[in-house]
Amino acid sequence: MIPGELLIDDGEHELNAGRATVTVVVSNTGDRPVQIGSHYHFYEVNEALAFDREAARGFRLNIAAGTAVRFEPGQERTVELVELAGERIVYGFNGKVMGKL
């Protein structure tokens, strides 16, 4: 199995169905590339990424598990985020939440 690989039957399948999403414009203001994995709490990503952080609180990239998005220096792109599921308790990352959302 390859990380992010989906082994499913034929037909259409909607990922993250019924979960809230938000779209944000992200700019890499730094001088190094920044890569963000599929399940990283987007609110807590590298400070060199400029975007509406409050809108991203409790959300992650809406991409397949095991994949990532790379932001090159000076690059601006629009990404879709999906709400975190489960108990919505966040520990670690950059230590900005350390508890329930």
From Swiss-Prot:
Intrachain disulfide bonds: none
Upper lineage: Bacteria, Pseudomonadati, Pseudomonadota, Betaproteobacteria, Burkholderiales
A GO MF label: urease activity
Cell location: Cytoplasm
Keyword vocabulary terms for this entry: Cytoplasm, Hydrolase
Family: Belongs to the urease beta subunit family.
Catalysed conversion reaction: urea + 2 H2O + H(+) = hydrogencarbonate + 2 NH4(+)
Record EC number: 3.5.1.5
HAMAP family for the chain: Urease_beta
GO biological process: urea catabolic process
UniProt keyword 4Fe-4S, yes or no: no
Cellular component terms (Gene Ontology): urease complex
Top EC category: hydrolase
NCBIfam families tied to this protein: PRK13203.1 (NF009682), urease_beta (TIGR00192)
Matching InterPro entries: Urease_beta-like, Urease_betasu_sf, Urease_subunit
Assembly: Heterotrimer of UreA (gamma), UreB (beta) and UreC (alpha) subunits. Three heterotrimers associate to form the active enzyme.
Name of the protein described by the UniProt record: Urease subunit beta
Gene3D superfamilies from the UniProt entry: Urease, beta subunit (2.10.150.10)
Organism: Paraburkholderia phytofirmans (strain DSM 17436 / LMG 22146 / PsJN) (Burkholderia phytofirmans)
Pathway(s) this gene product operates in, as recorded in its UniProt entry: Nitrogen metabolism; urea degradation; CO(2) and NH(3) from urea (urease route): step 1/1
